[in-house]
Amino acid sequence: MLLVAKLDSINQARIEGLIRYAPRRDFQPITFLVDTGSSQTCLLPDDVVRLGVDHASLPTVTKTIVTANGPVTLKLLRNVEVDLPVVGGILENKKALIKIPLSQLPLLPPGSDYVPLPQQMVFSLLGMDVLRFFPRWTFKKGKLLMDFGENELESLRQSLKI
């Protein structure tokens, strides 16, 4: 199975997925930037606002998180499901969603000086906690193809206790 990310105008790989979290029961679309420098998948302020996440009541990450822009304070959203589109089959024409349950998902709440970004610039980060299940990557025709092999499928089953 392949996770397919489209490369944008500056060759950043983006994936259109779905996200669901309590108390909401419905899935919401979300754009992820493939970020190998991020150890964890993380929601950024524009998605926190768009999804209507009540971040004030969420637990705060106690350790200091340092980003390229300096230290930040993250909150934790619990019991999240991220669904990512994959393709498979000999002709790579069979489409499916791979469901990735996350017991907690860090999010960066909007600050007091928050100003929304233009929609084409809005994304959250798909980190190595998810990307590690796709060990073989190739670039082809403006896309990043990430292969999800059988060994990784078994590893995913064991780590998620499926």
Description of each model-found segment:
Residues 1-162:
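Pepsin/retropepsin-fold aspartyl endopeptidases
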